[in-house]
Curated annotation (Swiss-Prot):
InterPro entries: Collagen, Collagen_superfamily, Fib_collagen_C, VWF_dom. Residues 138-153, 332-344, 839-851, 995-1005, 1041-1056, 1176-1191 have a biased composition (Pro residues). Keywords: Calcium, Collagen, Disulfide bond, Extracellular matrix, Glycoprotein, Hydroxylation, Metal-binding, Phosphoprotein, Pyrrolidone carboxylic acid, Repeat, Secreted, Signal. Residues 23-161, 1218-1463 form a propeptide. It comes from Bos taurus. This is Collagen alpha-1(I) chain. GO terms for cellular component: collagen type I trimer; collagen-containing extracellular matrix; cytoplasm; extracellular space.
Length: 1463
């Protein structure tokens, strides 16, 4: 249990760590100052800063910056333990082993006789965790970890409501631990601590009731001063000040957020023609056509009734051997066959069942002393011996698994610097210089006199920007900014708990009949009709040509048994039979096996030499021979290619000084070279003549800060900052009074799928679907399934005797026979070999404790322990050893130039030239490279006060506000009628809180509103601590069966039931196979000592038997008494939402329920629209004072209200939820959030196709719900908001998504009169005919813009599309002209990408016709069904049709436009 002392100690340590961290930062900033180490002295002992020690067992002290801070250890109260003991050097008492409270002791009668050992009970439930053991001695300090990253900013000093947990009357302040920093990397393991004293073994206690809060501890010492906190949040804006003069232009603002998506672009150019599409779905049933030619033979009809018996046919050829039939029933036993040849000796049979216990034999002679048996099981633990002398230190164990990260330790002292790392690799090679011009071979001349100074070059480019000057002193506070824009409404709250079901409303009046719905989708194919009567017998046809060999049919039903055949040849060797009874003693055996191989004999004499062998294969090449003598000089080779520049050689020796050369002519100025490394400073040159004044250089680096200027005039208020993030929800207010009864909730989310229902009654046969398009001729089909077995024919005549079949497979071993009678006692055998060690005997009684043994040798290295619990925060360790050298550094810069080389060999002497005169001054050189950055200039004088700056850009969004104070208990409002959700209005300004009104009478229940959209999931709350168990609720009604949850943890075993009656002995099943080795069970308590059995003889090791048959299931035992209820298992994952159930029958109205707990605060709502700009306000009074200075050592909590002192104050109140209601609320919030989240995730993973949860395409729906029927569903191909979802028809057989036109049929009438009826041309219906229109899609009431966007996405996600159009005609040719036999008068179709689709031409742009009834002018109405199928999905849907054969007064037409289907 986390005691108050722990908390105070934790706070003390956290404060120390904060202080230390601040000191380290301070040390780093001013490292030049040498600060002497701070120490503390107590009782004559000196302690370093941050040392922690216990001067007495019940006191703990820390050295804090020279001050000793001590605190008392407060112990937990031990209940029911009169003889508590305080261990040596410890402060808190513990209860010795075996001592129980008086209530547990009962009087006992005389001890009865010892019963037989009972069977081993089932494994008991895990006991509750025992109490914490006595703390061990502190371990040696570990090496210091590396410094952690800086902690998060501390809380400001004015957040009292959040910190009121550590209240103390006497304290003027208290420091609060910051959140835990991330753990540093793991340090080296410290040396093992000294072993703690042996703890007493506590009896496992019952789980106790939660104890009352302990008494309040004494006041802790004042914490060290905290690190300066970050600046507090800005105060509330003051009233606007007077308008200041406009300031200078502000810095450029951050880039704005991305703009809204732009307007829809212009229509793109037509794409290339796509490939021909696939056939669309079948159109509605056409009118009857004229009888067609005979169709291709149809599929095989259902099996007819059996015909008359035919004449016997000629015997067919022998068929291929059929598959083995199913094993027939066992025939009657045949006559005994002749004895087969003796079989091979079988393998050793499985070990037989033990025979019945034989009579005890006479005592045998004393056997040879057996090898020591395996160690028996550990006996019961003896009483603890006296502690032995300390053993040798054991070998270091392997590192344990890393424990849970402990609280971070205090930072250790800084270790000494590591040794110098190895030198870095040599820097990269410099670029080679350009080749010099070849000099004349003269001796080097003496150094000439310096030439005249050249003209000053133009000024170089501006140097780099100087370092940023030190930060100026803060200017005066600016005017307060205008009030921030109103924050958006918060996100939607979590769904409240379900309200109690309201009474059912009265039935409404019957509505008027609705308008006729749109034409239904084609029904599913009807079931096959009943078999027709058999037709009259046809004439015998001519024999057909032999067909191809069919596939082997499935095996027919087994025929009747034939007569028994003659005995077959001896079968293959069967499996070993069951072990027979022991036979009589056999005759003496044959001589034994040959002995083991003898020792090798002595080597024989050397034999004569053999013949020469054949020449061997070519050997591997030999090693290289010695180098030959040097050959003569060869002719000079042709010059090679220019080689790469070689690496720089070692510097040569310095050459001798040459003679003075002739000055050369002045060269033209070279191009500006690359900037060289900074050279060493040269000697000071002669003072040159002053150069002309250069242009003004760039500004130098800013000098040090000048004296503080006068305060500038206040700047204009900055633009409004973005509203801060929504603060954490304030602490929950107390529960309100119960509100009136709520409306009946909407139907809950779809439940998990129920168990499959019973088969329903067969539905009526559906209407026959429209004819599908003709498919391409299929490949030859595989043999169909075998037809049902015909009636059994008359028994055939017996066939000829077949050849003996192959021996069948060996049958399974039969069941083992009953136990045989015990055989006669055999003669004593020869003395057997020494037997294996027998099984371990039963554990002997516990002996008295032995004398203390000698110290044993160190044991072997132990197995790796399991990860221990996280340790308490360790004390700071001593400084670590110097670390190993660091890794090699990065390559260093190129080194300085090497020393002068050795003297070179002297070149041939050149002719001495005449002395030249000094050259003229050359033209000015090009500007030199930018100079190195200059040192900062001296401080400039204080500048004049600047003019105020312009309004700054809006500040960044403020940090999340701290949780508000706990709200007052609210009054329940009247439930209003739930209206439809209104459009989101701009949020009004928040009014001041009015006084609570009087409680109104409960309102009438409003009608249920539509269910709101699901809120976004809230942020994941931190897991609450375990709450105390709530009161038991009333029993709920049985819910629908959920899906089976994950298997719960095994419940605690019930008590042992009464012994059943002894059953008859079952037949012994054969031994099952050895199971896998189970995990080692927990060690059970030692059973009582059983009577000692006689030592059995060691049995021989049998071979492993074959796996036996599965035994029969035993009878079901009587039910045991109910076990105690197990702990509640974790909630199963939320199942997928089931389909919406049918409405239930009306229940009787329930009683008015109490109001449920208020739902958790919802996540923030979507941001509201920006309000209109208000009028500019008048300038306000001066702004609020600036942010507070850094806080002192603690937080001043003296202004908090005095807490009631009747009960001890719970110091961890705000850290721990010990209040059951708080826990319940928290759990409710978490559960609600989890349910909402899992529902949303389930909806994303498995959409329902509803308007609220649309699928992306029908193909997605089919994959998620393969058993759903075809019909209308909602899809949202572009995802995002579901308000633009469209309703489509999903063909669940194929996964096609079919989008219907908004107007599926065009009236049949005369649409067009041509001015010149003889001149025929294609006329577009939507573009050129009066009253015509281009076809739009998406069903009634959908927004065409939404549909266009959704179709674009649907096309992208589809690979093929198809559509049908039916053209109704009267005296108008649609496709084939019967008079001419050509397609000149065929219709044109226009696709979505404005491409024309024709009846003939390029096959990728042609449609097909499945039915053509408009081929001539008959004066009657006909129709032609056009189908277009393509993989270029951008061509569909069709938006216009152009007939050619129209324009006369007697020519009429109309269309039916089918859906465009995408797959």
């Amino acid at each position: 249990m986390f005691s108050f002392v722990d908390l105070r100690l934790l706070l003390l340590l956290a404060a120390t760590a904060l202080l230390t961290h601040g000191q380290e930062e301070g040390q780093e900033e001013g490292q030049e100052e040498d600060i002497p180490p701070v120490t503390c002295v107590q009782n004559g002992l000196r302690y370093h800063d941050r040392d922690v020690w216990k001067p007495v067992p019940c006191q703990i002290c820390v050295c804090d910056n020279g001050n000793v801070l001590c605190d008392d250890v407060i112990c937990d109260e031990l209940k029911d333990c009169p003889n508590a003991k305080v261990p040596t050097d410890e402060c808190c008492p513990v209860c010795p082993e075996g001592q129980e409270s008086p209530t547990d002791q009962e009087t006992t009668g005389v001890e009865g006789p010892k019963g037989d050992t009972g069977p081993r009970g089932p494994r008991g439930p895990a006991g509750p965790p025992g109490r914490d053991g006595i703390p061990g001695q502190p371990g040696l300090p570990g090496p210091p970890g590396p410094p952690g990253p800086p902690g998060p900013p501390g809380l400001g000093g004015n957040f009292a409501p959040q910190l009121s947990y550590g209240y103390d009357e006497k304290s003027t302040g208290i420091s609060v631990p910051g959140p835990m920093g991330p753990s540093g990397p793991r340090g080296l393991p410290g040396p093992p601590g000294a072993p703690g004293p042996q703890g007493f073994q506590g009896p496992p206690g019952e789980p106790g009731e939660p104890g009352a809060s302990g008494p309040m501890g004494p006041r802790g010492p004042p914490g060290p001063p905290g690190k300066n906190g970050d600046d507090g949040e800005a105060g509330k804006p003051g009233r606007p000040g007077e308008r200041g003069p406009p300031g200078p232009q502000g810095a450029r603002g951050l880039p704005g957020t991305a703009g809204l998506p732009g307007m829809k672009g212009h229509r793109g150019f037509s794409g290339l023609d796509g490939a021909k599409g696939d056939a669309g779905p079948a159109g509605p049933k056409g009118e009857p056509g004229s009888p067609g030619e005979n169709g291709a033979p149809g599929q095989m009809g259902p099996r007819g009734l059996p015909g008359e018996r035919g004449r016997p046919g000629a015997p067919g050829p022998a068929g291929a051997r059929g598959n083995d039939g199913a094993t027939g029933a066992a025939g009657p036993p045949g006559p005994t066959g002749p004895a087969g040849p003796p079989g091979f000796p079988g393998a050793v049979g499985a070990k037989g069942e033990g025979g019945p216990q034989g009579p005890r034999g006479s005592e045998g002679p004393q056997g040879v002393r057996g090898e020591p048996g395996p160690p028996g099981p550990a006996g019961a633990a003896g009483p603890a011996g006296n502690p032995g002398a300390d053993g040798q230190p054991g070998a270091k164990g392997a590192n344990g698994a890393p424990g849970i990260a402990g609280a971070p330790g205090f930072p250790g002292a800084r270790g000494p610097s590591g040794p110098q790392g190895p030198s870095g690799p040599p820097g990269p090679k410099g670029n080679s210089g350009e080749p010099g011009a070849p000099g004349s071979k003269g001796d080097t001349g003496a150094k000439g006199e310096p030439g005249p100074t050249g003209i000053q070059g133009p000024p170089g480019p501006a140097g780099e920007e100087g370092k940023r000057g030190a930060r100026g002193e803060p200017g005066p506070a600016g005017l307060p900014g205008p009030p921030g824009e109103r924050g958006g409404p918060g996100s939607r709250g979590f769904p409240g708990a379900d309200g109690v079901a309201g009474p059912k409303g009265p039935a409404g009046e019957r509505g008027a009949p609705g308008p006729a719905g749109p034409k239904g989708s084609p029904g599913e194919a009807g079931r096959p009709g009943e078999a027709g009567l058999p037709g009259a017998k046809g004439l015998t046809g001519s024999p057909g040509s032999p067909g191809p060999d069919g596939k082997t049919g499935p095996p027919g039903p087994a025929g009747q048994d034939g007569r028994p055949g003659p005995p077959g040849p001896p079968g293959a060797r069967g499996q070993a039979g069951v072990m027979g009874f022991p036979g009589p003693k056999g005759a003496a055996g044959e001589p034994g096996k040959a002995g083991e191989r003898g020792v090798p004999g002595p080597p024989g004499a050397v034999g004569p030499a053999g013949k020469d062998g054949e020449a061997g294969a070519q050997g591997p090449p030999g090693p290289a021979g010695p180098a030959g003598e040097r050959g003569e000089q060869g002719p000079a080779g042709s010059p090679g290619f220019q080689g790469l520049p070689g690496p720089a050689g070692p510097p040569g020796e310095a050459g001798k000084p040459g003679e003075q050369g002739v000055p050369g002519d002045l060269g033209a100025p070279g191009p500006s070279g690359a900037r060289g490394e900074r050279g060493f400073p040269g000697e000071r040159g002669v003072q040159g003549p002053p150069g002309p004044a250069g242009p003004r250089g760039a500004n130098g680096a800013p000098g040090n800060d000048g004296a503080k200027g006068d305060a500038g005039a206040p700047g204009a208020p900055g633009s409004q900052g973005a509203p801060g993030l929504q603060g954490m929800p304030g602490e929950r207010g107390a529960a309100g009074l119960p509100g009136p009864k709520g409306d009946r909730g909407d139907a809950g989310p779809k439940g998990a799928d129920g168990a499959p229902g019973k088969d329903g009654v067969r539905g009526l046969t559906g209407p026959i679907g429209p004819p599908g398009p003709a498919g391409a001729p299929g490949d030859k089909g595989e043999a169909g399934p075998s037809g049902p077995a015909g009636p059994t024919g008359a028994r055939g005549a017996p066939g000829d005797r077949g050849e003996p079949g192959p021996p069948g497979p060996a049958g399974f071993a039969g069941p083992p026979g009953a136990d045989g009678q015990p055989g006669a006692k055999g003669e004593p055998g020869d003395a057997g070999a020494k037997g294996d060690a027998g099984p371990p005997g039963p554990a002997g009684p516990a002996g008295p404790p032995g004398p203390i043994g000698n110290v044993g040798a160190p044991g072997p290295k132990g197995a790796r322990g399991s990860a221990g619990p996280p340790g308490a925060t360790g004390f700071p360790g001593a400084a670590g050893r110097v670390g190993p050298p660091g890794p090699s550094g990065n390559a260093g810069p190129p080194g300085p130039p090497g020393p002068a080389g050795k003297e070179g060999s002297k070149g041939p002497r050149g002719e001495t030239g005449p002395a030249g005169r000094p050259g003229e001054v050359g033209p000015p050189g090009p500007p030199g490279p930018a100079g190195e950055k200059g040192a900062p200039g001296a401080d400039g004088p204080a500048g004049a006060p600047g003019t105020p700056g312009p309004q700054g850009i809006a500040g960044q969004r403020g940090v999340v506000g701290l949780p508000g104070q706990r709200g007052e208990r609210g009054f329940p409002g009247l439930p209003g009628p739930s209206g439809e959700p209104g459009k989101q209005g701009p949020s009004g300004a928040s009014g001041e809180r009015g006084p609570p009104g009087p409680m109104g009478p409960p309102g009438l229940a409003g009608p249920p509103g539509e269910s709101g959209r699901e809120g976004a999931p809230g942020a994941e709350g931190s897991p609450g601590r375990d709450g105390s168990p709530g009161a038991k609720g009333d029993r709920g009604e049985t819910g629908p069966a959920g899906p089976p949850g994950a298997p719960g943890a095994p419940g605690a075993p019930g008590p042992v039931g009464p012994a059943g009656k002894s059953g008859d002995r079952g037949e012994t099943g054969p031994a099952g196979p050895a199971g896998p080795i189970g995990p080692v069970g927990a060690r059970g308590p030692a059973g009582p000592q059983g009577p000692r059995g006689d030592k059995g003889e060691t049995g021989e090791q049998g071979d492993r038997g074959i796996k036996g048959h599965r035994g029969f299931s035993g009878l079901q035992g009587p039910p045991g008494p109910p076990g105690s209820p197990g702990e509640q298992g974790p909630s199963g994952a939320s199942g997928p939402a089931g389909p919406r159930g049918p409405p239930g029958s009306a229940g009787s109205p329930g009683k008015d329920g109490l109001n449920g707990l208020p739902g958790p605060i919802g996540p923030p709502g979507p941001r509201g629209r920006t309000g209109d700009a208000g009028p500019a306000g008048p300038p306000g009074p001066p702004g609020p004072p600036g942010p507070p200075g850094p806080p002192s050592g603690g937080y001043d909590l003296s202004f908090l209200p005095q807490p009631p002192q009747e009960k001890a104050h719970d110091g961890g109140r705000y850290y721990r939820a010990d209040d059951a209601n708080v826990v319940r609320d928290r759990d409710l919030e978490v559960d609600t959030t989890l349910k909402s989240l899992s529902q949303q995730i389930e909806n994303i993973r498995s959409p329902e196709g509803s308007r609220k949860n649309p699928a992306r395409t029908c193909r997605d729906l089919k994959m998620c719900h393969s058993d759903w029927k075809s019909g209308e569903y909602w899809i949202d191909p572009n995802q995002g908001c579901n308000l633009d979802a469209i309703k489509v028809f999903c063909n669940m057989e194929t996964g096609e998504t079919c989008v219907y036109p908004t107007q599926p049929s065009v009236a049949q009438k005369n649409w067009y009169i041509s001015k010149n009826p003889k001149e025929k041309r294609h006329v577009w219906y939507g573009e050129s005919m009066t009253g015509g229109f281009q076809f739009e899609y998406g069903g009634q009431g959908s927004d065409p813009a939404d549909v266009a966007i959704q179709l674009t996405f649907l096309r992208l996600m589809s690979t093929e599309a198809s559509q049908n159009i039916t053209y109704h005609c009267k005296n108008s040719v649609a496709y084939m002209d019967q008079q001419t036999g050509n397609l000149k008068k065929a219709l044109l179709l226009q696709g979505s990408n404005e491409i024309e689709i024709r009846a003939e031409g390029n096959s990728r742009f042609t449609y097909s016709v499945t039915y053509d009834g408009c081929t001539s002018h008959t004066g009657a109405w006909g129709k032609t069904v056009i189908e277009y199928k393509t993989t270029k999905t951008s061509r569909l849907p069709i938006i216009d049709v152009a007939p050619l054969d129209v324009g006369a007064p007697d020519q009429e037409f109309g269309f039916d436009v089918g859906p465009a289907c995408f797959l």
